[in-house]
Amino acid sequence: YYVQAAEQLGDKTPADAEEVINTLKTLDFNTIDTVAIMYDATDYLLGNPMYNDDNPTDPTQFTGNLEASLDVLQSLYPQIRIIVMSPTYAYAIDEDGNYVSSDIYIYNGRDVLSTYVIKECYSSNLHSVSFMDNLYGSITEDNAKEYLTDNLHLNVKGRKLIAKRFEYFLNYYSKGYASQE
């Protein structure tokens, strides 16, 4: 699957893809309880296409890549809990280099960042996996300056916020965890 995805992505294959693939190959997924998948807003900022209605598992598309990954994980390891984590807020950059709202700025002719998150949530629901909304649930347009180093990347405080939220999300249904707040 990895090789096929890289072939379809061609020159859009990330530089560290081989390292990631080799790392994944060393894991024994039969010993793993939970897999967390988190996308940032890079696909949106690059204007990458989001979905292909004719091929919902097209790995060259934002949701197609997610759908294909969920299909593979669920078919090979049905015992694993999967948590899909949405991107946090990211500023779009306009033609003049200014940070602008990603809720109004369209890169590829049809989609704003929140549409990516909605599609990601929809894919998660189709596969009956957990979905953790970071766009509206943690780092938002209102507080992004406090948690980002630039328009996209989390600072230490932002990483800690997401880690704390993930820990809570991961353990919420564990016996007594929610009552420890």
Where do the protein language model's features map onto the residues?
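Active-site cleft segment of glycoside hydrolase catalytic domains centered on the general acid/base Glu
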Residues: 48-65, 101-109
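Structural recognition of the beta-strand scaffold that forms the well-ordered cores
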Residues: 33-38, 81-86, 127-130
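Conserved SGNH/GDSL esterase-like catalytic core that processes O-acyl groups on lipids
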Residues: 1-56
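Hydrophobic beta-strand residues in large extracellular and virion-surface proteins
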Residues: 35-37, 70, 82, 121, ...
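Hydrophobic pocket-lining residues that define ligand/cofactor binding sites across diverse proteins
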Residues: 73
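Generic structural signal for well-ordered alpha-helices
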Residues: 66-70, 114
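Catalytic His-Asp segment of secreted/periplasmic serine-dependent ester chemistry enzymes
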Residues: 87-181
